Regions:
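PP2C/PPM-type serine/threonine phosphatase catalytic domain
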Residues: 1-281
């Protein structure tokens, strides 16, 4: 079995908001991977005293334990229970009803001798490589399917000079429009304090015999495909296999450095936390 992971903050001066871990049972039969991408908080009060890395560490740890130790639980059930457990830790001190209480995107996979199960919530990615070499991305595309009016606001922001007052004003309008769709019908979903959100995840299972490898990516790593258009998902998986997870992160960093202002490749952050997990069970 091959297990490798790499994670790197977008800004060395700020904590990494991603979480990644892999657990193997003592029996050696099967395993679990969990990757979370913490949602960077806005620059205003969100009703919680805890930083995003605090949240992702606790949610990720709970998800890893529950999905690995209780194999009778489905992955959505494990995520739901992990969200509930994490919420209880700070319910008495924080306003968990706030729309921007700490939250994260999620990828999880669990394998046994017979089956590979998977879960994806929001814009992190799981790549499933089959033995014939084909690679299938498991994607939750709801964040890409925003209403046309919201997409138009995003393009307006990207078309204005960075640092300008006009861009800042347009960005505030765009952000407000996106926030109105967060964890709402017709919008997109992230793991925050509502355990019911787990049922919104993209899930499925495959025969273990069909799966050669699994690669989980936070969106800071998947931008190699989605933002910089350096290759297909199959190309991305090939880079990870050949150069390791750190190799993909290094490639992304080089692309970001070549376009620091996002002129050629518009994106929300010039650099983002980037995490890659490779498992070849």
């Amino acid at each position: 079995m091959r297990i490798e992971l790499a994670t790197e903050p977008g800004d060395p001066q700020h904590p990494n908001e991603d979480y990644a871990s892999v657990a193997l049972p003592a029996s050696g039969q099967g395993g679990v991977l969990v990757l979370l991408d913490g949602v960077t908080p806005p620059p205003y009060e969100v009703g919680c005293t805890h930083p995003v890395p605090w949240y992702t560490a606790r949610l990720g740890g709970a998800m890893l334990e529950l999905s690995g130790s209780f194999r009778d639980m489905t992955l959505p059930e494990a995520l739901s229970a992990a969200i509930s457990r994490t919420a209880e830790v700070h319910r008495s001190t924080c306003d968990l009803s706030h729309a921007r209480t700490p939250q994260a995107t999620a990828v999880a996979a669990r394998w046994s001798p017979d089956t590979v199960e998977y879960l994806v919530l929001s814009d992190s990615v799981l790549l499933v490589e089959h033995h014939d070499g084909t690679v299938r991305p498991v994607l939750d595309t709801r964040l890409d399917e925003l209403p046309p009016a919201v997409k138009a606001l995003r393009e307006t922001v990207r078309g204005l000079p960075r640092g300008s007052a006009e861009r800042a004003a347009a960005a505030r309008e765009y952000t407000a429009a996106v926030e109105a769709l967060r964890n709402a019908e017709g919008g997109f979903f992230t793991a925050a304090a509502d355990p019911a959100v787990a049922a919104r995840a993209v899930t499925g299972s495959l025969p273990r015999a069909e799966v050669r490898s699994l690669t989980a990516l936070s969106d800071g790593a998947s931008r190699w495909v989605e933002v910089f258009r350096e290759g297909s998902w199959a190309d991305c998986a090939a880079v990870v296999h050949k150069e390791g997870p750190q190799g993909l992160v290094d490639r992304v960093r080089a692309l970001e450095a070549a376009d620091p202002d996002g002129t050629a490749f518009p994106r929300g952050k010039s650099r983002d936390d980037a995490t890659v997990v490779l498992v070849a069970p």
